[in-house]
From Swiss-Prot:
<dbReference type="Pfam" id="PF13023">
    <property type="entry name" value="HD_3"/>
</dbReference>
<keyword id="KW-0464">Manganese</keyword>
<dbReference type="GO" id="GO:0002953">
    <property type="term" value="F:5'-deoxynucleotidase activity"/>
</dbReference>
<feature type="binding site">
    <location>
        <position position="41"/>
    </location>
    <ligand>
        <name>a divalent metal cation 1</name>
    </ligand>
</feature>
<dbReference type="GO" id="GO:0046872">
    <property type="term" value="F:metal ion binding"/>
</dbReference>
<dbReference type="GO" id="GO:0005829">
    <property type="term" value="C:cytosol"/>
</dbReference>
<keyword id="KW-0170">Cobalt</keyword>
<dbReference type="GO" id="GO:0005634">
    <property type="term" value="C:nucleus"/>
</dbReference>
<keyword id="KW-0378">Hydrolase</keyword>
<keyword id="KW-0460">Magnesium</keyword>
<feature type="domain" description="HD">
    <location>
        <begin position="38"/>
        <end position="144"/>
    </location>
</feature>
<keyword id="KW-0539">Nucleus</keyword>
<dbReference type="GO" id="GO:0050484">
    <property type="term" value="F:GMP 5'-nucleotidase activity"/>
</dbReference>
<comment type="similarity">
    <text>Belongs to the HDDC2 family.</text>
</comment>
<feature type="binding site">
    <location>
        <position position="69"/>
    </location>
    <ligand>
        <name>a divalent metal cation 1</name>
    </ligand>
</feature>
<protein>
    <recommendedName>
        <fullName>5'-deoxynucleotidase hdd1</fullName>
        <ecNumber>3.1.3.89</ecNumber>
    </recommendedName>
</protein>
<feature type="binding site">
    <location>
        <position position="139"/>
    </location>
    <ligand>
        <name>a divalent metal cation 1</name>
    </ligand>
</feature>
Amino acid sequence: MNAAKSLSIVPFLDCLSRLKTTPRTGWLYHGIEKPESIADHMYRMGILTMLCNDPSINKERCLKIAVVHDMAESIVGDITPHENVSKEEKHRMESEAMVSITQQLIPLNLSLQAEEIKELFLEYESASTPEAKFVKDIDKFEMIAQMFEYERKFNGEKDLSQFTWAGKLIQHPLVKGWLNDVLQEREQFWASVRQKKL
């Protein structure tokens, strides 16, 4: 990177831009054409964190974690279990990517902000705080909500029930309540699909 480039925000913006155009790989593996992007996923997660009504959780911090947690995927891509990459290797790759991304901010006198972004990522990865745990629940819930949207979009021609496993890991009562809403509506939807086939 030359000196002129190192003093520009553009390389950092380019990283963020890739999040807008990189599809969530899991949907591609299940035949969803033109699926949501990584940024689509993080945006809805961010909005959902703002609905947190638990006074013991800092929802502003949750929002920050939500919009940072998959940032490394702008470099490493959306790694799914299909790739057979170990959790340790995935964490190593993503941690290195976060260093690379945030280093672009240092020449712009944004060292503190770069450090905050890395800390938010590591907090999420380690699930070391109530906020990180809440965002992990939101991450799983958002995927299940998206699953149901795709099932409805394809009028019941695609059964994506293999994604529902994530719901069993959701802990926070608020997110569990939302999950129950989605799963109940999904049950009604599939009952209607089966009825039409009779």
